């Protein structure tokens, strides 16, 4: 297969949803249809050994939540799909935000009983920055749900995207009989109890087929015909151009747990979602089909293999081809490195990558030299833009149970901050270590990982910090004055960037009024 064909068949997407909308379940069913796994292990059975394939860190297995972003690659129809599973739990938004910078499209999973929820809104804001195309899956139709039309209206008004239904539900809850596939003009019937494997489904051609009335009942069949007449009048038809511009989303209905409707959604996604896209670097736009290799690191994951204390840097290939043993320019350090042991992923199962193409995600072994946002190229000096760090919203002081382990604690915290699990701040005026996170669960993860990976027992104490801002100033003299007068509020983060630690929002506002030339930033590019 030629290089252009290889790049053209790739589809790299992430799944976004509110916690508990069924994201991990849908990930599993997608893998089932991609023949990447033989049987789905439902996540709810937290006590059983059949844990979901994409939740593989100890803490995730214990709690039944996806904490880290896994990458899974599998073939479907004529495409090669790279699926990035993002943490669905309330607290892991920062990792999720960054993952969204590495994909070309997204699948949005909505719980049809609840509609658009808070976390989905936040994630959609990030996809908006790059007009990422979105495919929507309305989940949990085998339970009692809201009126589908009402949920579509909510998506349109709250997320600013037109909805084009591709399938439409026939009943819901105990009365859920299947979906009518608008593009195929056929009804696909649902049978419960087949969540773990792929079943042959029964279909009925045409909406006016008397067989439909005989199968689902005349009343339900008639009300579906009426609903569809309304839907066809009220909703736009699918338009590929608008979809690629992020202005319209195709909508599928089904139940991930019942393994129904996922395959139609996957067909739509592989047919319509874009192949690897052109990316903006600070210097120029980089086209996926260029010969020369380039890629950027969007995530670092520590100790994916408990048997080896290693760290893996996840790199999205933007252009060209990776071949085993090739030489790359690590742009930030200016060093040429030879990469012979990059890996590809199937959640937790790693295999050595011999070749990989634009759109693929590969893992580089990292011994502390690679950071989030780093660019690798075949010589050219490029820096890809738009890989954000977000100012934390929660802070704790971290303290050792054994004061002699200060060195291990610092090493562990710096490594965890480099991979984006948490942010660390060292005040200039004392020896405190302040940990900042976007959500509470991150604090638990840090303590658990410090103990498991660095043999350090740490505890938290409260600290009077409301927020943090990265500071810089074009005028050196004014910056010196600012530093002199604000020593007590200044700290260095894990990457030695100067940060203003504000005890209250009022304090932050006053500081920015007093020093108008100093910029206080809530996000920082890696």
Curated annotation (Swiss-Prot):
Q: Would the keyword Cell membrane be found if you checked this record's keyword annotation?
A: no
Location(s) in or outside the cell: Cytoplasm
* Molecular function GO terms recorded: GTP binding; GTPase activity; guanosine tetraphosphate binding; translation release factor activity, codon nonspecific; translation release factor activity, codon specific
What InterPro entries does the entry give? EF-G-like_DII, EFG_III/V, G_TR_CS, P-loop_NTPase, PrfC, RF3_C, RF3_dom_3_sf, RF3_GTP-bd
Q: Which GO terms describe its cellular component?
A: cytosol
The tr-type G domain extends over 8-277
Its GO biological process annotations read: regulation of translational termination
Q: Which Pfam families match?
A: EF-G_D2, GTP_EFTU, RF3_C
Tell me, what does this protein do in biology?
Answer: Increases the formation of ribosomal termination complexes and stimulates activities of RF-1 and RF-2. It binds guanine nucleotides and has strong preference for UGA stop codons. It may interact directly with the ribosome. The stimulation of RF-1 and RF-2 is significantly reduced by GTP and GDP, but not by GMP.
The similarity annotation says:
Belongs to the TRAFAC class translation factor GTPase superfamily. Classic translation factor GTPase family. PrfC subfamily.
Q: What is this protein called?
A: Peptide chain release factor 3
Taxonomic source organism: Aliivibrio fischeri (strain ATCC 700601 / ES114)
| Gene that specifies this protein | prfC
């Amino acid at each position: 297969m030629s290089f252009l064909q290889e790049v053209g068949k790739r589809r790299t997407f992430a799944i976004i949803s509110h916690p508990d909308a069924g994201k991990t379940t849908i990930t599993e069913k997608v893998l089932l249809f991609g023949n990447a796994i033989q049987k789905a292990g439902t996540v709810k059975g937290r006590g059983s050994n059949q844990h979901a394939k994409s939740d593989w860190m100890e803490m995730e297995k214990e709690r039944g939540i996806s904490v880290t972003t896994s990458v899974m690659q599998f073939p479907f129809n004529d495409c090669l799909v790279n699926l990035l599973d993002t943490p669905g739990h309330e607290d892991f938004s920062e990792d999720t935000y960054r993952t969204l910078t590495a994909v070309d499209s997204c699948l949005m999973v909505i719980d049809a009983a609840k509609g658009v929820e808070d976390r989905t809104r936040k994630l959609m804001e990030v996809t908006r920055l790059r007009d990422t195309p979105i495919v929507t899956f309305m989940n949990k139709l085998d339970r009692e749900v809201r009126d589908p039309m009402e949920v579509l209206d909510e998506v349109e008004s709250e997320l600013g995207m037109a909805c084009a239904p591709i399938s439409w539900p026939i009943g819901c809850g105990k009365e859920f009989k299947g979906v009518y596939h608008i593009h195929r003009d056929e009804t696909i019937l649902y049978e419960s109890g087949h969540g773990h494997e792929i079943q042959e489904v029964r279909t009925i051609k045409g909406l006016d087929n008397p067989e439909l009335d005989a199968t689902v009942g005349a009343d339900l069949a008639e009300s579906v015909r009426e609903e569809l007449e309304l839907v066809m009048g009220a909703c736009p038809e699918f338009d590929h151009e608008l979809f690629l511009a992020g202005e319209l989303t195709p909508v599928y209905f089904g139940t991930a747990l019942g393994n129904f409707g996922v395959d139609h959604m996957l067909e739509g996604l592989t047919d319509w979602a874009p192949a690897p896209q052109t990316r903006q670097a600070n210097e120029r736009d980089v086209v996926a089909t260029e010969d020369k290799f380039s890629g950027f690191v969007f995530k670092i994951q520590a100790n994916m293999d408990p048997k080896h204390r290693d760290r893996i840097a996840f790199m999205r290939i933007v252009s060209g081809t990776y071949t085993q043993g090739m030489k790359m320019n690590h742009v930030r350090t200016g060093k040429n490195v030879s990469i012979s042991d990059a890996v590809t992923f199937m959640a937790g199962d790693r295999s050595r990558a011999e070749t990989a193409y634009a759109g693929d995600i590969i893992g580089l072994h990292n011994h502390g030299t690679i950071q989030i946002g780093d660019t690798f190229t075949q010589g050219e000096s490029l820096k890809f833009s738009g890989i954000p760090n977000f100012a934390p919203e929660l802070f704790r002081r971290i303290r050792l149970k054994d004061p002699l382990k200060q060195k291990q604690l610092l090493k562990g915290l710096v490594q965890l901050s480099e991979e984006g699990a948490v942010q660390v701040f060292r005040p200039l005026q004392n020896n405190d270590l302040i940990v900042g996170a976007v959500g509470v669960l991150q604090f638990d993860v840090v303590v658990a990982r410090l103990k498991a990976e660095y043999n350090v027992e740490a505890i938290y104490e409260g600290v009077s910090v409301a927020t943090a801002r990265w500071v810089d100033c074009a005028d050196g003299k004014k910056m010196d004055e600012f530093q002199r007068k604000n020593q007590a509020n200044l700290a260095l983060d894990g990457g030695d960037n100067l940060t203003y630690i504000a005890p209250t929002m009022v304090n932050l506002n006053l500081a920015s009024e007093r020093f108008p030339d100093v910029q206080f930033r809530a996000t920082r590019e890696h």
